[in-house]
Regions:
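C-terminal helical subdomain
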Residues: 71, 169, 193, 215-256, ...
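Short acidic-hydrophobic sequence patches enriched in Asp/Glu that either
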Residues: 41, 209-210, 220, 266
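A glycine/serine/threonine-rich, flexible loop-to-helix segment
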Residues: 200-216
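A short, mixed-charge helix-start or loop-turn motif at secondary-structure junctions
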Residues: 11, 158, 162, 214-218, ...
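Short glycine/threonine-rich loop-to-helix capping motif typified by GTGT followed
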Residues: 205, 260-261
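Short, flexible, mixed-charge acidic loops at enzyme active sites
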Residues: 149-154, 206-210, 248-249
Length: 281
């Protein structure tokens, strides 16, 4: 299928499934706009995209998505340079062994895995509307099935563990996707989320503690980044899912999210709480 003339914004596009998704979409003719933290990896990835897929003017913007000001600034930068965005892939994510808070007072996992996609999507909303029909795809995880929403402790000040923080952030991701789709109904912008499965990537390498070792073992049995990116690429490009929205996918199959994640009251309350924390009306 062709993505000629389409612009795709991708976070976490310099490694792993994000990079594989960027390459696959570029091969279809899409123009890739990356959001990256590391300038060295960003420039290397951009150079490779331009060399392998010269038909489009690929670009990269730099931001530390742990910082609220950076989230808002990079969204504004992209909105200022892109008249339309056909696909937004919120793919960047991490797990951290120890609880640390950002300059804004957010626990890091919550900031990167939930607040950043929320802020970036909000900041790019007019460009997505301008491209309608457009798509938002959020990378989530099956571990959300093990989480309960704790609106009274979004900053995870009580009983922090890396596992708890991660699964809670993935629950937030599913809830955000569902509420986004509800609020944007009629805008011709779909919103879906996907668990790509276990993939052999760099995920967890810099998390600290025993997390790198744990993921190293898991990655021995994981699929390749290219294969892991397939469900994301499908949601971004396939006409088969063009009309689907507010859905959760396990790999390439439509699946049921947890009852906690399908609770509309949870989704609405989380949206309002996140908007308040992020200073978004």
């Amino acid at each position: 299928m062709s993505m000629e003339g389409k612009t795709c914004v991708i976070t976490g596009a310099t490694s792993g499934i994000g990079r594989a998704a960027a390459e696959a979409l570029a091969a279809m003719g899409a123009r890739i706009v990356m959001v990256a933290r590391d300038k060295k990896r960003g420039e290397a990835t951009l150079a490779e995209l331009r060399a392998r897929f010269p038909g489009a003017d690929h670009s990269v913007h730099y931001a530390d998505l742990l910082q609220l000001a950076n989230m808002k600034r990079v969204a504004a930068d992209i909105a200022a340079t892109e008249p339309r965005i056909d696909v937004l892939l919120n793919n960047a994510g991490a797990m951290f062994a120890w609880r640390k808070v950002t300059a804004d007072g957010f626990e890091r996992t919550f900031a990167l895995n939930h607040v950043a996609p929320f802020v970036l999507t909000h900041g790019l909303r007019e460009r997505l509307f301008a491209a309608a029909p457009a798509r938002v795809v959020n990378t989530t995880g099956a571990l959300h099935h093990l989480a309960k929403l704790h609106l009274d402790d979004l900053k995870l000040e009580r009983n922090y563990t890396a596992f708890y923080a991660y699964k809670h952030s993935k629950l937030c991701s599913v809830l955000f996707t569902r509420e986004l789709a509800r609020r944007w109904a009629g805008k011709q912008v779909t919103a879906n989320c996907v668990h790509p499965g276990e993939v052999a990537t760099r995920f967890g390498e810099q998390a600290g503690g025993l997390i790198p070792l744990t993921f190293a073992v898991i990655h021995l049995f994981g699929s390749s980044p290219k294969r892991g990116a397939n469900p994301i690429v499908r949601l971004a490009s396939s006409p088969d899912v063009a009309a689907m929205t507010r859905c959760y996918f396990y790999k390439e199959k439509l699946a049921r999210a947890s009852p906690e994640a399908e609770n509309d009251d949870n989704a609405s309350r989380l949206w309002k709480a996140t908007a308040l924390l992020a200073g978004i009306e």
